[in-house]
Amino acid sequence: MTGYVTDALFGDPRTGHPVALFGTAAARLEHRLWADSKPRGAAYAALCTFGAVGLGAALQLATRRRPFARFLLTAAFTWVVLGGRGLAAEGTEMARLLEAGEVPEARQRLSHLCARDATALDSAELTRAATESIAENTSDAVVAPLFWGAVAGMPGLLGYRALNTLDAMVGYRSPRYRRFGWAAARADDVVNLVPSRIGAALTALCAGGRARESWRVWRRDGSRHPSPNAGQVEAAFAGALDIRLGGTNSYGGEVESRARLGEGRHPEPVDLRRAVRLSRLVGLAAVVIAAGAAPATPWGASPVQSIGSRWGQSPARRSVDNSAVAGLAVHNSAVAGLGVDNRR
């Protein structure tokens, strides 16, 4: 919970962001290892990802007898791998630019959300692109880190963010990365299979009076997207907001036609603001679930539980009702249960 709240209050670290440092190191390794080869790309993805997982596992083991240190590290890693505040800020700024009719500025701003070619996009297409990115990144930048943090603690947090970053760097279908980036892209698909569907279900849960429509559109249209994961949350958002997503997109000169998701109107800037609000609600629901799930997983168990357990076993505390300690542990279990963008 501490990491989630820190991200909500302050957003990404302004300097020396660990994800940016990882990206710099990964880019240097790519320069040394690149070849138009799937095996070479798989080796590159494995080195980068297992390096991050290994660091997380080493810190998890090193702090097994130091619950407060584990608490601080888990909170810090959760903060740096989450992107909820930054995502909401970018969506809100895009909505402001589009409402003001500042289309050239909105075209430039879209690159903060996705890799789509915005050169020829009008206001309607910019709105659709931003709304789709808000939906997809609600899963990628919020739900998935929380899920992997709850399941696998620090190794899960760092490993997931490493894979997601590699996918954003090399997971393209361009001539350079079609083969070299294949392994990173497929691995990212695998680790997002469960979180994306949790994100879609939470979207329907948070859709208020359109919960049934969100669920129906998700189940009907989620598999129509070329990505096994992005379409799940995008379809749920389309149903929740009563809008239509999908269409023709351009990436680096390659044109891609995607199936329509939903059956409502074309999204407008006001719908982009609604998508941001829905994204925040989904994030809150996800952190509540992560808080409840973390104590049940060996690597995701809350360090506060360990603190409470040791305190309760001390002679000075034997007379204290242990249920208070247990309640404190449950309330704070999100500490370890918590845990921007890809080929759009």
Regions found by a protein language model. Name each.
Residues M1-R344:
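Short amphipathic, positively biased membrane-proximal segments
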